[in-house]
């Protein structure tokens, strides 16, 4: 994988994709993602489905290397129900930096307290990418770090590439891919292209 984010090449992302394709469990996928995000300069990640995290099902994505104390707090106090990161990023097609949450929603006191509690566990700055596929549960992929500085365009693009690969493989592993997808023609055939 890459030496550092600023020296990353597309072949580095290809290596991540190949490693993800080889895994057969979500635990293995989580390990590959953890190694990849660290190689690219991030500290933490989470790949989770929308919904009640207390009622974990085998077909639910819930992979993270967040501090265990934070994960326990999020689940036991049901903070995921009021997470402004998920609420705001769901309104973005391409991901959202946490410092821009107030540009997208007017966070309530309760939502702001979720951010404060996350900071208390070291999750200071982050970038979250939403996934919405018709007929499937929504999901989010997040990278986070301790440093309080905005994510660069290169960092956001890196997170998007890793997120796409991780989410796709995660869906395959938990059975989230719809087997009967209707065919939809988005373009009319153009003469001479066939």
Regions found by a protein language model. Give the residues of each.
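Short hydrophobic beta-strand micro-motif common in sensory/regulatory domains
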Residues: 125-131
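Sensory-domain boundary capping and coupling elements
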Residues: 132-145
């Amino acid at each position: 994988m890459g030496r550092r984010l600023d020296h990353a090449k597309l072949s580095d992302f290809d290596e991540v994709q190949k490693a993800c394709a080889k895994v057969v469990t979500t635990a293995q996928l989580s390990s590959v993602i953890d190694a990849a995000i660290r190689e690219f300069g991030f500290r933490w990640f989470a790949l989770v489905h929308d919904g009640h995290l207390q009622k974990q099902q085998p077909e639910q994505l819930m992979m993270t290397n967040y501090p265990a104390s934070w994960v326990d707090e999020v689940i036991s106090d049901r903070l995921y129900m009021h997470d402004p990161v998920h609420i705001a990023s769901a309104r973005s097609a391409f991901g959202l930096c946490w410092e821009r949450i107030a540009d997208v929603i007017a966070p309530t006191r309760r939502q702001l307290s979720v951010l404060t509690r996350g900071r208390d566990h070291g999750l200071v700055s982050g970038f979250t990418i939403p996934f919405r596929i018709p007929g499937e549960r929504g999901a989010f992929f997040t990278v986070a770090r301790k440093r309080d500085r905005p994510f660069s365009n290169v960092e956001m693009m890196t997170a998007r590439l890793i997120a796409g690969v991780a989410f796709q493989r995660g869906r395959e592993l938990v059975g989230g891919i719809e087997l009967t997808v209707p065919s939809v023609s988005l373009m009319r055939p153009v003469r001479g292209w066939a």
